[in-house]
Every structure is written in structure tokens, then in C-alpha cells.
Amino acid sequence: MSHRKKAVVLLLGIFVTIVLFLFFQALFMPKYMESMKEGALIAEYDKDSLNHEVVFIGDCEVYENFSPVTLWENYGITSFIRGSASQTIWQSYYLLKDTLRKEKPEVVVFNVLSMQYDQAVSEAYNRMTLDGMEWSDVKVEAVKASMTEEESMITYLLPFFRYHSRWSELTKEDFRYLFRKNSISYNGYLMQTGVKPAEVVPEGRPMADYRFSDRCYEYLDGIRQLCREEGITLILIKAPS
């Protein structure tokens, strides 16, 4: 075999290997289309037109309590919710930073519940926020700030190395949404049809410590600084749990 043919065979082999690697990586990654839909929310922002007057950031209390459809129909306000399950304040900071790379809303609404956590809740929740972000230097910073001791950057760069063990857990959902994903939210709002209005609101449980950590205050100040630099109004809220 000539050197030229050997080179062609080698390049073809490399190409096929890369294609198969990317195929199985996409197959093994969770789809979040039929179960744990919260994991698909972050990625939906980049599919939407970037012309929002209001952007919400925070945990489940924003994507379950605020309706962009209602804001538009009743008040003519365009909005999007960049919420995710158990989103930490440093993840909110980097999601805002990521948002400002693409658009400049007039108002940013941040739900302060996450200030009670000064460390990552779990890798699973990290994944539901970080895997959906587009790759950029901001995502790299977000991953570094969020990783638990057991996690590594390579598993975010190449998720195959994190999810390859799912081969025995694959379901029809993994194949059905391998090449396409449906929208599961309305501008980041996740409709929960099983939620019923509360008839009785119980008293809040007392906490052992009501102080927030320095780390949380630092990121809260970072959010404030980003908004001030861009002339954005920052609204802090605590939505019902």
C-alpha cells in the first residue's frame, strides 16, 4: 500500500472514530425531555430570539412562579427565565454574565433563596445547569466555580467520560431525542400541571443560622456590579417555595 493510501486510510479511521465518539456521547447524555425536564431549561435560552426586557435568574422558584406569557399578554413585557434546579448564586452570576454576552435586558430579577448555600448541592444539579450552557470562557469559569471535589473539567469538556456508564440505563427517550429536542418550556417557564393552589400556608421552620456566607455575598455583589456596569435595574426577590 502506498504512503498516500495509508494516509487516506488513517484519516478515514480518525474521522470514523470521532464520529462514533460524538454519536455515543450524544446518546449517553441525559435528554431531559420526558423525565427531569428541569435539566433541559438552560439550553433553551440559546434557541430563543434575544430581545428580552426582563431576564430572571435563580432556582426552581423562578421557573415555577413567573410566567413570561402572562407578562407579555397582560403588560407587554418580553422576558426569559434562566432558571434551573438548585441553581447556586455563583451559577446565577455566570448565567447573567453569559446573558450579557448576547443581549442587555432592562431588568434582571434574582431570586435570593440560593444564598443559603455556600457550596454545590450535588454533581447532578451542577449538570442540570452547566451542561446546557454554550461553550465559552464564561462556561469554563462557571464549571470551575461549581465543581465538587469528585468532578473534573474533562468530563464537562467531553461528557462521554461522565455518562458512558449509562449504556445499561438507556431508554426509548435517549433514542427518540438523540438528534432533536423539543421545547419543554415557555421562555424558561416550566408548567407544572400537578401543582395545586395552597389552601394552608404552614409557618416557616426555624433555621440554626440565618447568616449568609462571605462567598454568597461576593457573588451577590458581582451580580450587582454586572448590572450597574450595563445600566440594568436589579430586583432581588424571594418567591414562594
Question: What is the predicted function of each stretch?
Answer:
Residues 5-27:
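Hydrophobic membrane-insertion alpha-helices, especially the h-region
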Residues 38-43, 64, 94-97, 217-223:
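Alpha-helical scaffolding within the catalytic cores
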Residues 53-54, 107, 233-235:
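Structural motif
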Residues 54-55, 76-81, 199-207, 238:
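Acidic/histidine-rich, surface-exposed loop or edge segments in extracytoplasmic proteins
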